[in-house]
Amino acid sequence: MKKNIINVLVFISFSLFCCVSICGVACSSKIELSSKDLISVMDRYLDLLVKNDPVGLPVANNIKITENGYPIQLGSGLFQTAEEITYKQYMADPSVGQVMVFGVVKESVLLANFMVRLKVDKDKITEIETIVARKDESSFASPEDLKEPRPIYARVLSESERSPRDVLIKIANSYFEGIEQNTGEMVPFHKDCNRYENGTQTTNNPSTIATGCKEQFDDKVYSYITKIRNRRFLLADEEKGLVFGIVTFDMPGKRENFEYFPTPFDELPTRFYKPRSLLLAEMFKIVDGQILSIEAVMVNVPFGATSGW
């Protein structure tokens, strides 16, 4: 009898151990960091970035890191030159464990626009993707104009204004299709749509391009962009109507491609005369199925360059 009781107790103990172990594995595999948690990880990253010291970052052994499309080692690149972050605009997506920030960084005496994307798996950073748009390498760069995040991106939409994740991505992709095909007819632009590139408003702005989002497409302003590739839509936020992606524009630099550009070809900066590509990170605000605002950080790269991903 005593032996039977001992056997029963052993069986129960073993069963409980197995249940706890299995539950532990199951629970750990379902850990999902909240938006607040992901932004905290980004803040920790940026804090160490300006200290030029990656020690203390919770990174995975197989971490992948790129800067402006090129693979780099942890602690190199912007990690060696960043001194201060003067502007931050976040977006997080707990469903994919990713967070990004558009920001302005001070390097020595110069300011630069930048984007950092982190992917976090449980408690480890597995991906770090950075784009740094310094003034001598970028178009429309005016980091000094960015002081506070635009409130439009933080606004939570009503249920009737929202679109599902797949629709948000489809709408954002239609924007790139419209550029390739030189038409705004396929792109659902909001009548009040505006675009900001490296801190500069590039729509409805007489000092850059005076026409609006749809008008620029219909006027074939971007006919010098012949291909948009490596399209990756990485984060989405249905509540706020946000979608974020990274793409590459190809620009062969041929004179005939600038026929409809508002500035005469011979008056354009010399960078327009040569083949180049553009690595872009873009965030879209989509309300009622229409693109209301676009925010981008972009940098010139060699023609045909990849994003590194």
Where are these regions (language model features)?
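Bacterial N-terminal signal peptides that target proteins for export
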Residues: 1-12
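Bacterial N-terminal signal peptides
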Residues: 10-21
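C-terminal and inter-domain tail/linker signature
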Residues: 23-309
